[in-house]
Design a protein with these regions (language model features):
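Residue-level structural signal for beta-strand termini and adjacent loop
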Residues: 196, 220-221
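N-terminal signal peptide c-region/cleavage motif recognized by signal peptidases
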Residues: 15-17
Length: 315
């Protein structure tokens, strides 16, 4: 009896183990025909050459699914992209400086005139005395009680009727905790994030995985913590902010990474494509762009480009 029981238990354990192995998700090859990244804004906060401030859009199967940042002018690019806001699952904010977030209320206002029914997820770092948290940002923007546009507050308030709700998630930010955190994993899209160093301002880097492809975003950061190569490891695309030249000093160097670091980061992460965005007057001129490119290529030998608004890049 003991032998039979042991055999039965052993068989069940083996069966369960086999089922567990077979049920694990095996990483698939990047289905690049299904995924594309579109530039909604490729400049910083300055009023330069008619390009919008920071914003990116990830498409899956010809549907706009993820927005990263919502800088001034990026909503207009969203409209020009022919995307439908009803399809968007989430807006990921790297941080809450105006050049990354100012168009958010306009997205929500515009969505009022669409057929959107599903909830919208909003994520961003926790706040400090210098910037708001994601929750406070949303409340100050469209909250019923203290928002700039309180007439949009029903989308945040679960007690009020609205066609859909905005679900806000604060991502814990810390210089001392560089743990990669999974913040969303549903409907075929997985999002992970890590805290980054943007001077005293809470900021997040993101990695979005879908259809076997991975696209990572540095946001604004100086690279001092060395956090991004791990998050972006083997990404098909890495979007890096090239806001300053190599000779940057002081505040600029404390807020942004230099081209030489971008090259080292891209090499260490082993990314397939490197996109340089968030260009500013100090990094935009052709001479400066060439200097940045030369410094980056000393370490990174992969595909490097400077995309403009509305450009589409496939993994």
């Amino acid at each position: 009896m003991h032998i039979k029981t042991g055999l039965i238990v052993g068989t069940l354990l083996l069966s369960n183990h086999a089922f567990s192995l077979s049920s694990q998700v095996v990483p698939e090859k990047c289905q690049s025909q299904c995924v594309k990244l579109q530039m909604l804004g490729t400049r910083g906060p300055e009023l330069l050459d008619g390009q919008a401030s920071t914003g990116y859009l990830i498409w899956l199967d010809d549907k706009a699914r993820v927005i990263i940042d919502a800088g001034p002018g990026s909503l207009q690019r969203f409209k020009q992209s022919k995307a439908n806001f009803e399809d968007v699952d989430m807006i990921l904010f790297t941080h809450f400086h105006a050049d990354h977030s100012a168009d958010f209320p306009s997205y929500i206002k515009g969505a009022f005139f669409t057929d959107r029914k599903k909830d919208l997820s909003i994520m961003g770092p926790t706040g400090t005395k210098f910037t708001t948290s994601a929750t406070e940002f949303a409340e100050r923007a469209i909250g019923s009680e203290k928002g700039l546009y309180p007439y949009l507050g029903a989308f945040l308030d679960p007690k009020q009727h609205s066609a859909y709700k905005i679900k806000v998630k604060d991502i814990p930010w810390s210089f001392s905790d560089l743990t990669i955190k999974e913040v969303s994993n549903k409907d075929g899209i997985r999002v992970t994030t890590v805290s980054t160093h943007h001077g005293p301002f809470p900021s997040q880097g993101y990695r979005v995985e879908l259809a076997g492809c991975s696209i990572s975003f540095t946001g604004d950061m100086n690279g001092r913590l060395g956090e991004m190569p791990t998050l972006a490891k083997d990404s098909d695309i890495l979007v890096a902010h090239n806001a300053v030249p190599e000779d940057a000093t002081g505040v600029a160097a404390n807020l942004h990474m230099k081209p030489s670091y971008i090259g080292k980061m891209a090499k260490q992460a082993n990314v397939k494509k490197l996109l340089l965005t968030h260009l500013m007057e100090r990094s935009l001129p052709e001479k400066r762009k060439q200097e940045s490119l030369n410094l980056i290529r000393k370490n990174y030998k992969g595909d490097v480009s400077f995309p403009n608004d509305l450009d589409v890049i496939r993994p």
